A protein has these predicted regions:
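Bacterial N-terminal signal peptides that target proteins for export
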Residues: 1-8
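Bacterial N-terminal signal peptides
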Residues: 9-16
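Structured C-terminal helix/loop/strand segments within mature extracytoplasmic catalytic/sensor domains
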Residues: 23-61, 69-71, 167, 213, ...
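Acidic/histidine-rich, surface-exposed loop or edge segments in extracytoplasmic proteins
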Residues: 31-44, 88-94, 112-115, 152-159, ...
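Short, conserved catalytic-motif segment at the N-terminal edge
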Residues: 70-99, 114, 118
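Short, well-structured active-site flanking segments
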Residues: 115-133, 144, 235-239
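Active-site-adjacent helix/loop patches that line small-molecule binding or acyl-intermediate pockets
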Residues: 42-64, 72, 127-208, 214-219
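Active-site SXXK
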Residues: 99-122, 135, 306
């Protein structure tokens, strides 16, 4: 009898082991992300005319601020002409340069969150709605920290031993894997944004010396913004929600001259008295960087994405609008 019981026990253990192993195989073989059925990356055609325009626009900024020692290495820019959605043209200046993006990374987290919600990976709550709004509209770092926790199933805390840290790091890198699955390269979007500094496991994950900080290129940023505008990243309803969060009232009054509507690309529209234009954007600003990712529509039919990243001139408000003004003045001349 004892032999029969022992044999049955072994059989049960074997079956459980086989079922577990088989289940793990099925899970690992399944795709991690569900992209929209009709999703395909925006097709971009390099345009010599746009390249000449963008080179001149960046050159105008370099000339204007040469007395302050603004150099080519301090500016990166990408321009996408969206007037013909079926035939997108683009150009870039240092567009593949990896640069710390500051709060521009929050746009990437917004898109990921909307994908998670659409796929049922997370369930929308009032607190999540509040966090998303504050992350994009007010550029709140605390809200971003919460949203990244939701996206990755990780949380801040004390440093971890190696094995536990590896598990935590794999989960935290899920947003990177999401964008890699769509063909994005040369970017890193796995870090929380802080008003001061990171501590504990966040500093451990950053690499202590900062070698795992968030990094974006203007090319990748412009591509994502164009895909949002064109409705490629999600449903029409979720696209509208994201666009509403990024809508900027540059013509309205503000108590903060450096807010996202009045302190970046919006300055160009204000200077040119283009109150009938429309602006959607996500800006980023630190002690060393000043960036903006903007989509503009004008009354005369111009539609374009312009992403400008600047380094080492964080408090110079007019570099980005100088580039934008030149684009506004000349894009309409290109057919």
């Amino acid at each position: 009898m004892k032999k029969i019981v022992a044999a049955l026990s072994c059989l049960v253990v074997f079956c459980l082991f086989y079922a577990s192993a088989n289940a793990q195989t099925v899970v690992s073989a399944a795709p991690e992300f569900k992209l929209p059925k009709d999703y395909k990356p925006v097709g971009l055609e390099a345009s010599p005319a746009l390249q000449t325009l963008l080179d001149a626009a960046v050159g105008a900024a370099l000339e204007k601020f040469k007395d302050k020692n603004l150099a080519a290495k301090d500016v990166a820019a990408t321009l996408i002409d969206l007037r013909d959605a079926g035939n997108l043209k683009w150009a870039s200046v240092r567009g593949e340069e990896k640069i710390y993006p500051a709060s521009v990374s929050k746009m990437f987290y917004m898109v990921a969150l909307q994908r998670w919600l659409e796929d049922g990976r997370v369930k929308l709550t009032p607190e999540m709605e509040r966090g998303l709004k504050d992350m994009i509209v007010d550029s709140s770092n605390e809200a971003t920290q919460y949203i990244l926790d939701v996206l990755t199933g990780t949380s801040s805390g004390a440093e971890l031993p190696e094995k536990e840290f590896e598990t935590w790091a794999f989960k935290r890198n899920v947003v990177n894997r999401f964008y890699a699955a769509q063909g994005y390269r040369n970017i890193n979007v796995n870090q929380k944004t802080f008003c001061e500094d990171a501590y504990g496991i966040e500093q451990q994950f950053r690499g202590y010396k900062g070698n795992n900080r968030n990094m974006l290129t203007t090319n990748a940023t412009a591509r994502l913004l164009a895909e949002i505008v064109l409705g490629r990243t999600n449903t029409p309803e979720r696209t509208l929600l994201m666009m509403n969060l990024m809508k900027r009232d540059f013509a309205g009054e503000s108590k903060d001259p450096d807010d996202q509507a009045h302190g970046f690309t919006g300055i160009a529209l204000i200077n040119k008295k283009m109150n009938d234009a429309r602006l959607w954007s996500k800006a980023g600003w630190t002690s060393k960087t000043r960036h903006d990712a903007a989509y503009i529509e004008t009354a005369d039919g111009q539609k374009f994405v312009l992403v400008v990243f600047t380094e080492n001139f964080a408090n110079e408000r007019n570099i980005i609008p100088t580039v934008a003004e030149k684009v506004l003045e000349n894009l309409g001349k290109i057919k």
